[in-house]
Amino acid sequence: EQGDHVLMTNTAYEPSQDFCSKILSKLGVTTSWFDPLIGADIVKHLQPNTKIVFLESPGSITMEVHDVPAIVAAVRSVVPDAIIMIDNTWAAGVLFKALDFGIDVSIQAATKYLVGHSDAMIGTAVCNARCWEQLRENAYLMGQMVDADTAYITSRGLRTLGVRLRQHHESSLKVSEWLAEHPQVARVNHPALPGSKGHEFWKRDFTGSSGLFSFVLKKKLNDEELANYLDNFSLFSMAYSWGGYESLILANQPE
């Protein structure tokens, strides 16, 4: 509502950040951002009017993993009624059991791993008992209803989710380990890879890994070099919507 405050990780998916800065701001809702590795120090950013704390773990593009228990405990100690949300797309809602960690609402782009075949678009939101009536009513009032075909396709994807995620884990780790040893690569950001930011929290809190990770080249490419680099991949296509059976790559400048 007007006058409320949202506290969001600065590694949230860019459209999520844009929704706050370009839409909610016009409705009188302010947003501030915090470092994904802040842990219990998040208390320094909480305000009396903080109503939403928005997490995404691992972070978009740069893949930092939150210390979720520390964040949740800190938020509850200062603004106990604030709703803690997480974008749980990377973990497909199953590799990280968000509600078990005290999070109120867990959302994901089910277009990715739940559908699993890049042939439908759907989002999901699950919540605890405290938030259920509010979530149900707002989804109803905003007309957020899935069509029958998409519901069927998503339920089909759920049948193979476990075996697909195990393969994503294995394949992505093999590729990331190979890249980590490559002379042209400065850093690999994969939560399951030792040395990645927040790896210890992934190891403690997650039950596996999906297939999305990032890496940084030692040389910063200009536009022509980058286009040539991407155009010469034979096994990876360039596209946004990961989570299917294809191998995809996308260039990004998160700074």
Where in the sequence are the language-model features?
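Conserved C-terminal alpha-helix-loop-beta "cap" of PLP-dependent enzymes
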Residues: V185-E255
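Conserved PLP-enzyme active-site core in the AAT-like
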Residues: E1-H182, N189
